[in-house]
Amino acid sequence: MAYPGSPILMKLLVFIFLSTFVVTNVSSETKCREFKSIISFGDSIADTGNLLGLSDPKDLPHMAFPPYGENFFHHPTGRFSNGRLIIDFIAEFLGLPLVPPFYGSHNANFEKGVNFAVGGATALERSFLEDRGIHFPYTNVSLGVQLNSFKESLPSICGSPSDCRDMIENALILMGEIGGNDYNYAFFVDKGIEEIKELMPLVITTISSAITELIGMGGRTFLVPGEFPVGCSVLYLTSHQTSNMEEYDPLTGCLKWLNKFGENHGEQLRAELNRLQKLYPHVNIIYADYYNALFHLYQEPAKFGFMNRPLSACCGAGGPYNYTVGRKCGTDIVESCDDPSKYVAWDGVHMTEAAYRLMAEGILNGPYAIPPFDWSCRSSGVKNSGSSDT
């Protein structure tokens, strides 16, 4: 037993005092922060031009051509939309420049942001997927490749190790969306749903490992998105069209079984993020509920200014969902709608700027960030872009 005034008791009291101070200090820092930059990883949902930068100039991908980028930028930028993406609206909210792509950039300034997200990227390594008969032509840039590019580029981005750690500590690190293409490519080669489900824990472990590595490098705040409700995807609604009406949600017209798959991914990802949060209490790990942020637009399209056919693509080529497999937006045989701001879906796979703006608002101002961001030390909110031509 320790008695009053004894050295053991004094040491115990000092330890308790310091422990309380440390916990309090960490908690106050993670409530509201002024981010100095954005570091982004992921796929086409966050790609601001990386796939374009990696492409052969003689064989450019379809999003390198109009009508991609026609609103806001007024020319293609390598983004898979008619305008800005969620990451762009986050940057605007934080008062930061739009995050430049890393790959193919020349003399770009990455001091306030750098983006490694590549259209078509997977969480798992290409060789791992190909060994399981899952082949894809788009890119060999996995999450691991992106992370390695980031580590190798640090001396040129931020200089000394101490400066780099400071940059990473004060950055909002956007981890995706990533993993959706792992599932997409498996569906595209007709893998069964049970076999595709086996990829889920592997995808989530890969995301978790990347977050853990970035925490070791100084990462303090992570925004980790879940998947879209793929049962509402124009591509999947077209490729998995069925006469069995019981497979469709009567309110939205989305495929219930595919949406359940997306929900399962989100549940497993959130459980893993909760585990990481307990392991690293000094870090702020925020789940971005892309699933419900987008699904809400399908549930009540008129409320958000969309037309009453939200499952129809703006840039498409006929059919019940204005989408034909193999006929891509950005080619001469596909036309764009007159007013993309009235559409949720852009090209059958990706969303319009109008949809992305609303999703960003739901993440930044609630209710689709878990736990929610605390902006009490800030005076500004998401800027309403109004017209997508502004």
Swiss-Prot record:
Record bears the keyword Signal: yes
One of the Pfam families matching this protein, by short name: Lipase_GDSL
Secretion signal span: 1-28
Glycosylation-annotated residues: 140, 322
SUPFAM superfamilies in the cross-refs: SGNH hydrolase
Gene Ontology MF: a single term: hydrolase activity, acting on ester bonds
InterPro entries assigned to the protein according to its UniProt record, in alphabetical order: GDSL, SGNH_hydro_sf, SGNH_plant_lipase-like
Compartmental location: Secreted
Broad EC category: hydrolase
Keywords annotated in UniProt: Glycoprotein, Hydrolase, Lipid degradation, Lipid metabolism, Secreted, Signal
Residues forming the catalytic site: 44 (nucleophile), 347, 350
Keyword Secreted: yes
Cellular component, GO, one term: extracellular region
GO terms, biological process: lipid catabolic process
E.C. number(s) listed in UniProt: 3.1.1.-
Family: Belongs to the 'GDSL' lipolytic enzyme family.
Record-given protein name: GDSL esterase/lipase At1g28580
Source species: Arabidopsis thaliana (Mouse-ear cress)
Organism taxonomic ancestry: Eukaryota, Viridiplantae, Streptophyta, Embryophyta, Tracheophyta
